[in-house]
């Protein structure tokens, strides 16, 4: 005997072990004493597991002092003969069972014994190992039987509720012990609670034909006594009253109104007595067991899922004859199989899944996304790895196939998704369960209760994937499913691992991933590994670390998908196929995010400045701050709570707390900032996120990309480092920190892309470049810059962060700004002001009579002072610092006689001053610097009459006021501007001046008139809380909107000066205090206004639209007013669009065929309309071949046939360089000066090359393969067809080519004018029938007509004659 772990045993007898290998008995007792460790251990029993080849041993520590800890788990390898076997011991106390424990292949014996005792209330039943294996299924799949129990109780409740007075129903639902009706006690609210108690009984009755309960129970009775019904009732019935009630009621309704399982067993025993004289009674008894199970399946309504294949009409003689012929003394019972039609997979399944998830207008982002979805769903490749940039839509790559699998009726697929961190769990489950397409549950449910038969996808973290319980359940999947669901049509689907690069890069967690190597990967249909930061080297190492072969040696191109027929080796030994979308697209990721690297003195102070500025500009936005340590996370959270609502997360929190906090931040719109370590940068999808700030000095390139990738739709990312401290040393095995310099170049180097250092297009969203940024991001940058300039001009700076942290949340403080209609920045709430209370008047100095002073420091008689510091008689001062007689001062700092001052700083006689800084007559108030007469002053600071007050810069009554240059008589000017603190801390105002600016966003909610206007607008435009567009507002149907939708229309569509004022509210273009936007509004009034302007453009030609812009000049700065003006004509505009665009919808939506032969003018006036489809295609390819050879600028050529050269355009490898080349040669500037493009904003045409036309781009790229086949069919030399950017340049040039447009509309009679670029692009992609009835895209016909206009075949002046004839015919027709 050789011991692998070199332990020495004092005494060991392995003869019994060796004999056990050949022993056929279920239970083998071994009396030997083996010292596995220092405590003597008695081996009670052991057996060989046929599947795993392990010998499983149950042992008991005879010398243990604590019997509850007497068992422990240990695996020891010993040499038995020539074979090495492993002995496994169970971790449990000695079971309370007379016959001794029998080990199970699935779980420890104590749970089985507990279940037997719960069901039968006895200790004397002796089952064989098969019974234990069957009983153990309950614990492995408890969730499934819980769901069945809920269904049973719901059915009972429905029956009782439908027939409450029926006597038979009352008997059925009657407690057999007390005889009292129990219908009233069964309520919907208690069904789930009672269902858990009922689940073991449901399991037992469904599997009654697989257990030896009947025969074993009789054998356990003493002496000659056989069946005793009362004994059965005592032994077999549950003891709890609640269990008695519901268990008896369902048994009553199932077995001919008989009570409980005891009567079922009594019936079985009577049948046994009938055949007691020969052994053939046993098979008959087994048949009854099958019948019992079948009845239960029928009663539960599971016939649609299960079909009992055995016959219920077999007689005893047939059974005896069959038994005699069988060598086995047990008859084989036919399995219950699932009866469902087979449904093959189809590529259309993915499209249907997308429409279920996103609506009928669903289209793929691009060709790569479509092919990858088909690869995952249709191909036989067992293991797939995908690298795609953050925000690309990696989730949909497996989400759509999972929905397609769930729609299949023949097989139930159960898939698993694992993410690296707990904080992603809640976010993933919310995203994947939307629209109800998938049933999603935590993987913990599967580990604890097993498969419930309902869930399609279980979601967990890497620790769950590595756990022993999970790997054991997957290893026993086939046996569990066959015994539980009685079918083999419940299969393991996909194993999906998100952000799998962590297996290699997370050095400190690699020891936790060791258990993954024990997972049976071959049990899954397919393994899918996803990441945004896993180049080939990282991906290969990560896959090998978890026990897979790694990547295929040959890197696979997504355009060369090949199917492998040799899959016999299994998933774990098969190389993983890698699809690198970043290399395929050759575009550097994250170009849509503006990345700024700043070195600052204090990272927290700079971060706070940026956050406050962001929330001043975008009050509803969110931000993420990444800190380097857990202590820093908590310190920042405590410090910033007084400014905005904060959620903080780090690794020391519990799993449930992480999930709860993440869900709160994602779903609660009032939460502003998420602070955490790097675990918050992976996988979280937050729609309102507009800023990411990173304070980690050890940030590596993967963490940077993951953090920036949270900004899905653009935004700002700041990397803040302390001066002279960025160079941080990386820990062993980790990636080095990022270096100073261009971030884009480091991203290119990481992904293995071509370096552009020192070349055009090097900077993409970094180093000040804004070329690739969206319009919203550019506008956000500009507004942040302007706000920073204002702060610098005002010399507002931040002092040091406070050393003590307050735990109270300052959200209440923010609510104060939002809730009060009378709040003012100059109010003082329960505090004393120590700095400039009761100071002098600023702005202008004037003496006025019968005038209106705005923002002035003045002495006035019979006037109205608005926002002034003034001395007034018989006047009303609103929001001013004034001295007044017989007046009412609201929100003012005033000197008053016989007046009521509300929240003002005032000088008063016979008045009441509340929350004010006041100057009064003949009295002195300590601690407030105020003088009053017959008045009450609270929390004030003021200047008085005939006195000089400290802490103020004012003197009164026949005096001269310093710093104001104002002359007053018997009056006091006080508190022109106060530094006020709402919470009694005067230092807060000096801490961060931006806080005062931040309050402006809340002041806009203060006016009653504004609130009233806001409510009116919300009622007039109710759908702005959803993703509504102006076409929905007009009343168009969704199928019409799909083709009329205004792709590419944004704020740059508006001419300069129209809805583009800066320094105002971004949503409504009003001053912040007059803002009419409301919380939860997803579509701004400004956006609806520019879409409404685009709708008006749809109905007008160039001259008419230019006149229209002049007519709406009063609304150029008022999008809300324009919307009201537009909505008045809502019905008229709808009818006009339906009338003018009926032809367009017929072609694009209903796909009516356009035939060139149907156009009489076309056949007579153009040779193109007499050409075949083959000739049109040849001409199209020839035009592009000539353009490519001559390096002609495409847009300019199709605009006016100018063959100007632009080599950079043809050599550009991405869209950014292409657009830069066009801008360099002045194409966009010439286009605006020569065409109607000047009626739009200066950036409108340029931005069409960004992300506006994704769906059309995807459709065009899908057609590239067709073009290649056409060239081969035509017999021409295959040439490169234009890529999307060049193709779009062609369409833009044709759209603004007025001469070409006029001729095309004249020749092709089926079309008319379209005045929006997106409609023109959509129209160009429809198909037309050429003269030989072959289909060609309309854009090919357009190029042919354009070429004909440029040729010498058209006589000079011929086209003008044609247009003249057309205009004449129109006049005659009209």
From Swiss-Prot:
Stated induction or repression of this protein's expression: Induced in absence of telomerase TLC1.
Species per Swiss-Prot/TrEMBL record: Saccharomyces cerevisiae (strain ATCC 204508 / S288c)
Entry-linked Pfam families: DEAD, Helicase_C, Sir1
Protein name stated in the entry: Y' element ATP-dependent helicase YML133C
Alphabetized SMART domains for the sequence: DEXDc (SM00487), HELICc (SM00490)
Family: Belongs to the helicase family. Yeast subtelomeric Y' repeat subfamily.
PROSITE patterns according to UniProt: HELICASE_ATP_BIND_1, HELICASE_CTER
Taxonomic lineage: Eukaryota, Fungi, Dikarya, Ascomycota, Saccharomycotina
Biological process per Gene Ontology, one example term: telomere maintenance via recombination
Composition skew (Basic and acidic residues), residue ranges: 976-999
Alphabetized PANTHER family for the sequence: PTHR31583, PTHR31583:SF2
Transmembrane residue ranges: none
GO MF term set: ATP binding; ATP hydrolysis activity; helicase activity; nucleic acid binding
Domain of life: Eukaryota
InterPro entries assigned to the protein according to its UniProt record, in alphabetical order: DEAD/DEAH_box_helicase_dom, Helicase_ATP-bd, Helicase_C-like, P-loop_NTPase, Sir1_ORC-binding, Y'_ATP-dependent_helicase
Region feature Disordered, mapped onto this chain: 832-999
């Amino acid at each position: 005997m050789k011991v692998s772990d070199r332990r020495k045993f004092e005494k060991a007898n392995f003869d019994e072990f060796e004999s056990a290998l050949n022993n056929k008995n279920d239970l083998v007792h071994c009396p030997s004493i083996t010292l596995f460790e220092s405590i003597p251990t008695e081996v009670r029993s052991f057996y060989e597991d046929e599947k795993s080849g392990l010998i499983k041993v149950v042992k008991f520590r005879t010398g243990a002092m604590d019997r509850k800890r007497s068992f422990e788990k240990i695996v020891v390898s010993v040499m038995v003969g020539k074979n090495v076997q492993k002995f496994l011991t169970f971790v449990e106390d000695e079971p309370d069972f007379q016959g001794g424990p029998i080990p199970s292949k699935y779980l420890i014996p104590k749970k089985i014994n507990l279940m037997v005792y719960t069901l039968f209330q006895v200790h004397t039943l002796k089952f064989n190992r098969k019974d234990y294996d069957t009983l153990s299924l309950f614990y492995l799949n408890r969730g499934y039987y819980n769901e069945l129990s809920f269904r049973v109780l719901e059915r009972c409740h429905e029956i009782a509720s439908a027939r409450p007075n029926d006597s038979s129903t009352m008997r059925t639902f009657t407690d057999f012990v007390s005889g009292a009706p129990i219908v009233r006690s069964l309520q919907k609210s208690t069904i789930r609670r009672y269902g858990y108690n009922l689940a073991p009984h449901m399991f037992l009755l469904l599997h009654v034909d697989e257990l030896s309960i009947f025969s074993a129970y009789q054998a356990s009775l003493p002496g000659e006594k056989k069946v005793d019904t009362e004994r059965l009732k005592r032994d077999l019935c549950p003891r709890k009253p609640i269990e008695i009630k519901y268990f008896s009621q369902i048994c009553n309704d199932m077995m001919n109104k008989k009570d409980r399982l005891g009567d079922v067993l009594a019936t079985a025993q009577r049948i046994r007595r009938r055949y007691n004289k020969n052994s053939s009674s046993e098979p008959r008894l087994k048949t009854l067991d099958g019948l019992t199970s079948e009845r239960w399946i029928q009663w539960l309504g599971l016939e649609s899922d299960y079909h009992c294949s055995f016959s219920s009409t077999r007689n005893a003689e047939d059974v005896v004859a069959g038994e005699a012929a069988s060598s086995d003394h047990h008859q084989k019972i036919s399995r219950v199989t699932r009866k469902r039609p087979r449904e093959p997979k189809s590529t259309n399944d993915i499209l249907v899944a997308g429409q279920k998830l996103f609506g009928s207008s669903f289209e793929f982002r691009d060709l790569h996304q479509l092919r990858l979805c088909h690869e995952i769903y249709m191909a036989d490749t067992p293991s797939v790895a995908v690298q795609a940039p953050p925000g690309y839509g990696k989730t949909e790559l497996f989400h759509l196939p999972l929905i397609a699998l769930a729609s299949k009726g023949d097989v139930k697929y159960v898939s698993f998704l694992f993410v690296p961190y707990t904080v992603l769990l809640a976010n993933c489950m919310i995203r994947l369960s939307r629209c109800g397409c998938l049933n999603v549950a935590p993987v913990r449910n599967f580990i604890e209760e097993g498969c419930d038969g309902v869930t399609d996808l279980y979601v967990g973290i890497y620790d769950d994937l590595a756990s022993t319980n999970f790997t054991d359940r997957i290893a026993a999947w086939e046996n569990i499913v066959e015994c539980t669901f009685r079918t083999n049509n419940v299969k393991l689907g996909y194993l999906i691992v998100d952000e799998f690069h962590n297996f290699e890069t997370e050095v400190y967690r690699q020891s936790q991933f060791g258990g993954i190597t024990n997972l049976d990967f071959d049990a899954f249909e397919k393994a899918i590994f996803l990441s945004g930061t896993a180049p080939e080297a990282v991906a290969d190492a990560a896959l090998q670390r978890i026990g897979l072969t790694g990547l295929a040696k040959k890197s696979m191109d997504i355009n060369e998908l090949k199917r492998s027929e040799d899959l016999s080796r299994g998933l774990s030994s098969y190389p993983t196929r890698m699809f690198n979308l970043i290399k395929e697209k050759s575009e550097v990721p994250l170009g849509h995010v503006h990345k700024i690297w700043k070195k600052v003195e204090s990272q927290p102070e700079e971060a706070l400045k940026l956050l406050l500025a962001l929330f001043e500009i975008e009050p509803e936005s969110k931000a993420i701050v990444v800190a380097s340590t857990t202590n820093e996370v908590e310190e920042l959270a405590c410090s910033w709570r007084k400014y905005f609502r904060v959620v903080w997360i780090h690794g020391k929190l519990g799993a449930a707390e992480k999930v709860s906090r993440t869900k709160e931040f994602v779903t609660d719109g009032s939460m502003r900032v998420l602070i955490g370590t790097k675990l918050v940068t992976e996988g979280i999808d937050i729609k309102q996120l507009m800023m990411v700030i990173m304070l980690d000095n050890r940030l590596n390139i993967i963490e940077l990309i993951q953090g920036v990738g949270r900004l899905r739709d653009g935004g700002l990312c700041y990397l803040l480092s302390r001066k002279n401290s960025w160079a941080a040393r990386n820990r062993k095995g980790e990636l080095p920190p990022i270096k100073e310099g261009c971030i884009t170049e480091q991203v290119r180097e990481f992904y293995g892309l071509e370096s552009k250092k020192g070349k055009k297009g090097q900077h993409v969203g970094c180093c000040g470049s804004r070329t690739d940024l969206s319009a919203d991001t550019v506008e956000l940058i500009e507004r942040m810059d302007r706000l920073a300039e204002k702060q610098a001009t005002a010399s507002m700076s931040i002092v040091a962060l406070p050393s003590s942290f307050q735990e109270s949340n300052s959200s209440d403080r923010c609510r104060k700004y939002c809730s009060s209609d009378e709040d003012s920045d100059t109010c003082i709430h329960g505090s004393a002001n120590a700095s400039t209370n009761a100071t002098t008047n600023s702005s202008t100095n004037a003496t006025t009579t019968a005038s209106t002073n705005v923002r002035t420091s003045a002495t006035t008689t019979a006037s109205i002072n608005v926002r002034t510091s003034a001395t007034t008689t018989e006047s009303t001062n609103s929001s001013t610092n004034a001295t007044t007689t017989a007046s009412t001062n609201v929100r003012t700092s005033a000197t008053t006689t016989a007046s009521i001052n509300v929240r003002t700083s005032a000088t008063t006689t016979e008045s009441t001053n509340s929350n004010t800084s006041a100057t009064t007559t003949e009295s002195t108030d300590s601690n407030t610097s105020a003088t009053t007469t017959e008045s009450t002053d609270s929390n004030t600071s003021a200047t008085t009459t005939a006195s000089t007050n400290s802490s103020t810069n004012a003197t009164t009554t026949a005096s001269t006021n310093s710093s104001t240059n104002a002359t007053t008589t018997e009056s006091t000017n006080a508190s022109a501007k106060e530094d006020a603190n709402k919470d009694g801390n005067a230092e807060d105002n000096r801490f961060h001046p931006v806080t005062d600016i931040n309050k402006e966003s809340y002041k806009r909610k203060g006016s009653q008139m504004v609130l009233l206007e806001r409510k009116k607008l919300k009622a007039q435009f109710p759908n702005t809380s959803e993703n509504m567009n102006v076409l929905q507002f007009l009343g168009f149907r969704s199928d019409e909107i799909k083709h009329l939708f205004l792709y590419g229309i944004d704020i740059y569509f508006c001419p300069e000066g129209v809805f583009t004022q800066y320094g105002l509210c971004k949503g409504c273009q009003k001053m912040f205090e007059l803002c009419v936007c409301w919380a939860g509004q997803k579509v701004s009034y400004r956006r609806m206004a520019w879409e409404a302007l685009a709708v008006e453009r749809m109905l007008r030609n160039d001259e008419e639209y230019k006149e229209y812009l002049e007519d709406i000049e009063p609304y150029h700065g008022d999008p809300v007013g324009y919307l009201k003006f537009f909505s008045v004509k809502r019905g008229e505009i709808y009818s006009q669009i339906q009338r003018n665009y009926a032809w367009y919808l017929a072609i694009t939506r209903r796909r009516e065929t356009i035939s060139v032969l149907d156009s009489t003018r076309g056949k007579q006036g153009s040779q193109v309309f007499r050409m075949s489809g083959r000739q049109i295609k040849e001409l199209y390819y020839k035009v592009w071949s000539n353009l490519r050879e001559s390096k002609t600028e495409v847009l300019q050529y199709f605009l006016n046939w100018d063959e100007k050269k632009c080599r950079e355009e043809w050599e550009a490898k991405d869209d950014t360089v292409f657009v830069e080349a066009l801008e360099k040669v002045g194409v966009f500037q010439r286009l605006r000066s020569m065409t109607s493009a000047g009626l739009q904003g200066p950036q409108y045409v340029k931005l069409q090359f960004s992300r506006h036309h994704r769906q059309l781009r995807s459709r065009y790229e899908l057609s590239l393969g067709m073009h290649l086949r056409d060239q081969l069919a035509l017999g021409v030399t295959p040439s490169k067809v234009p890529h999307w950017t060049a193709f779009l340049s062609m369409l833009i040039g044709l759209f603004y080519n007025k001469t070409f447009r006029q001729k095309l509309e004249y020749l092709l009679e089926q079309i008319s004018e379209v005045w929006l670029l997106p409609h023109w692009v959509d129209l160009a992609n429809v198909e037309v029938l050429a003269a030989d009835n072959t289909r060609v895209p309309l854009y090919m016909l357009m190029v042919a007509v354009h070429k004909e206009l440029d040729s010498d075949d058209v006589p000079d002046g011929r086209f003008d004659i044609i247009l003249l004839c057309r205009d004449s015919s129109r006049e005659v027709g009209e």
